[in-house]
């Protein structure tokens, strides 16, 4: 049985599918000494040598193990690999891999802090991010503005934002953390559109003044993980997260 090259290499952690496709376009990937094309399928029986940017790599699943790390992102860091403004980048804080590279499972904007997951398994990252799988993301949200029962109902039932409708799966007040000017909430979404939570509150004339992600799927931000630090998930936790999208650890 054959599979597309970008799917295989993405699954084995050599980059996202888009990144693999770009490398193919630039002639950076070859099989048995011949450059390949996007969409080309692989049959393992016919492969002798595969190289990426001149370095020989293995595509045997027995040589690959899915890794996932949790990073506690501080405010002020961005979730891209390069930034012309020279702002701090989350990838610079992660442990080095050999030829594989970390793939972010979703993003947080520069002013949001908290849980970020990274994996070396491209297929797993894609599945965990895909809206159809409805993976829960949970946040602490500090809000400034006039909020009443009707406001909460609107946010649960759905509000119109720039790229369509959006609604919290659940949202509740954290009473002990509220002040006269700001109120804290715990909210759950099942998707991760750009600045979605901030846009939802803006649609009801309120402003998010702090946003912290505390959970992705069944993975919670450890209370003892300091801002700017990372920790690797156990094999059991990797399998539990993978099972949410019916993918077992490789």
Swiss-Prot record:
Gene Ontology process terms (BP): pseudouridine synthesis; rRNA processing
Pfam hit, one: PseudoU_synth_2
Q: Name one GO molecular function term.
A: 23S rRNA pseudouridine(2605) synthase activity
EC code(s) of this entry = 5.4.99.22
The protein's job, in short, is: Responsible for synthesis of pseudouridine from uracil-2605 in 23S ribosomal RNA.
Q: InterPro entries of this UniProt entry?
A: PsdUridine_s_RsuA/RluB/E/F_cat (IPR042092), PsdUridine_synth_cat_dom_sf (IPR020103), PsdUridine_synth_RsuA/RluA (IPR006145), PsdUridine_synth_RsuA/RluB/E/F (IPR000748), PsdUridine_synth_RsuA/RluB_CS (IPR018496), RsuA_PseudoU_synthase (IPR050343), S4_RNA-bd_sf (IPR036986), TruA/RsuA/RluB/E/F_N (IPR020094)
List residues traversing the bilayer: none
According to its UniProt record, which residues of this chain constitute the active site? 109
Q: Does the keyword NAD apply?
A: no
Keywords in alphabetical order: Isomerase, RNA-binding, rRNA processing
SUPFAM superfamilies of this UniProt entry?
Alpha-L RNA-binding motif, Pseudouridine synthase
User: Which reaction(s) are listed as its catalytic activity?
Assistant: uridine(2605) in 23S rRNA = pseudouridine(2605) in 23S rRNA
Q: Which residue ranges does the record assign to the S4 RNA-binding domain?
A: 3-73
NCBIfam families from the UniProt entry: PRK10700.1, pseudouridine synthase
Species name: Buchnera aphidicola subsp. Acyrthosiphon pisum (strain APS) (Acyrthosiphon pisum symbiotic bacterium)
Give the protein name, as stated in the record. Answer: Ribosomal large subunit pseudouridine synthase B
User: Which family does the similarity line name?
Assistant: Belongs to the pseudouridine synthase RsuA family.
On the tree of life, the source organism's domain of life is Bacteria
